[in-house]
From Swiss-Prot:
UniProt organism field: Lactobacillus delbrueckii subsp. bulgaricus (strain ATCC 11842 / DSM 20081 / BCRC 10696 / JCM 1002 / NBRC 13953 / NCIMB 11778 / NCTC 12712 / WDCM 00102 / Lb 14)
SUPFAM superfamilies: P-loop containing nucleoside triphosphate hydrolases (SSF52540)
Name of the protein in question: tRNA dimethylallyltransferase
EC number(s) on file: 2.5.1.75
Primary gene name: miaA
One example GO MF annotation: tRNA dimethylallyltransferase activity
Length: 308
């Protein structure tokens, strides 16, 4: 089974720099595990590795697509797995670096994913009719009757997920929650998590936003705002939508910058919650441990010798 290392953690903790250091120590190449770094038109708000950093170590799935293209998690997984195969084919270590937990999870494990068209086709029309006639609450209650465990994990308002779960139950005759629990491992992976004191992370987030503003984030956000027609994924990215009220003349720039810092701190908290609940992570503190990168490199080398 192919060995893969993932380096995860909250925004601004230092994943990119540490991943590059580890890649240089252990002859690896990096696959971005970030849902927004794939887009070539946005660089500042997505905190991509710099051109100089990318020249040091080869990066995959950075600047690979336009914001005007549809790019689903399934597309990401397909391209990332291809990149892992390419890296392994060169005898190098594939290193996933990123903070989008669901994307990393989907990549490392055999999660059942479909593109938008496949997902739409997999929905039972009878449940769509039921939803239209009775609403999200009634739909969720039907799911709760048939599969309480699945219902616990799906918000009442998320009709799309309720539809999918009920459709799977109707089609297979089995519980949706049981099928989700049977997700298989795709790779032999080691997940390294970076984290530190909450206030230290929050301070780094605030500093990063200030540096992004100096680097031209406002103009990048203006580009996104001016192309907001449609359903482009980047419209929902933290770092851009917070400035929309400013461009619309509804809020001051200072207010929007503060909103971005707040949104980024909340996102960091959600990232940590996901990684702690969904993935087997070994945690390290790069902000207080000056030997962190060396300790991680030693741990990876030990793990590389293990058989699975």
């Amino acid at each position: 089974m192919q060995k893969v290392v993932a380096i995860v953690g909250p925004t601004a903790v230092g994943k990119t720099s540490l991943a590059i250091e580890i890649a240089k120590k252990l002859d690896g190449e990096i696959v971005s595990g970030d849902s927004m770094q794939i887009y070539k038109e946005v660089a500042i708000g997505t905190a991509k590795a710099s051109r100089e950093e990318q020249a040091e170590v080869k990066h995959y799935l950075v600047d690979a697509h336009s914001v005007f293209e549809d790019f689903s998690v399934k597309n990401f997984v397909d391209e990332a797995r291809s990149a892992i195969g390419e890296i392994a084919g060169k005898g190098k270590l594939p290193i996933i670096a990123g903070g989008t937990g669901f994307y990393v999870n989907a990549l490392l494990n055999d999660m059942q994913l479909g593109d938008k068209e496949e997902e739409a086709a997999s929905v039972d029309p009878e449940w769509e009719v039921f939803l239209a006639a009775n609403g999200p609450q009634a739909l969720w209650e039907e799911l709760n009757k048939k599969d309480p465990e699945a219902a616990k994990k799906i918000p009442v308002a998320n009709s799309r997920r309720s539809l999918r779960a009920l459709s799977v139950i109707s089609r297979t005759g089995g519980l949706f929650s049981k099928q989700q629990a049977e997700i298989k491992t795709r790779y032999d992976y080691l997940i390294i998590g970076l984290n530190s004191d909450r206030e230290a992370i929050y301070q780094r987030i605030n500093q990063r936003v200030d540096l992004m503003m100096e680097a031209g984030l406002l103009e990048e956000a203006r580009f996104v705002y001016e192309h907001r027609a449609g359903e482009h994924q980047v419209l929902q990215a933290i770092g851009y939508k917070e400035f929309f009220p400013y461009f619309a003349g509804e809020a001051s720039l200072e207010t929007c910058v503060m909103a971005l810092k707040t949104a980024s701190r909340r996102y960091a908290k959600r990232q940590l919650t996901y990684f702690r609940n969904k993935l087997p992570v070994e945690w390290y503190d790069p902000l207080t441990d000056p030997n962190c990168a060396n300790r991680i490199a030693v741990r990876i080398e030990e793990w590389m010798k293990e058989e699975k």
